Amino acid sequence: RRPVWLVAFDQEEWGMVGSAALAAQLKQADQALKLMVSLEMLAYTSPSQGYPHPAMRAVYGDRGNFIALVANAGAGLLLPGLARAMGRHVPTKVLPVPNGGRAIPDVRLSDHSPFWDQGYDALMVTDTSFMRNPHYHQMTDTVETLDLPFFCGVVEGLAEALG
């Protein structure tokens, strides 16, 4: 068994200040890390889904009813098993991204990307936030807009996948 850290980062919207500091500190200390998992917006579903590249619609569909697992190359090796476990609880799609996600900047917009930049394996679990949720970062982003049964499925899937 390995130690598990639960870390809540601050200032993601200001340049991922907290996660960048921890990733750099771990790298400087030559600290090994099996996997960093960033939980980024997990409870919104929609009959429509946006994408950073139109071609992604053909692969991932046009309904925002899934959770996405976005991983760099090293973490991508874990994707099949994680996706199977998550998929038993909630529709799950995977997006392995090469080169730290630089070709698709929108996949770098959370606290996992500083870990990618430091050479760590990292995974973002997301409902795709603003690509489907019109309430994202708005006053209307309230619990009433969330799909709580979907969120429960995400939590159950994470417990199975990472447990």
Tell where the protein language model's regions lie, with residue ranges.
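Acidic/histidine-rich catalytic neighborhood of metal-dependent amide-processing enzymes
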Residues: 1-74, 80, 104-107
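Active-site-adjacent substrate-binding region
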Residues: 48-163
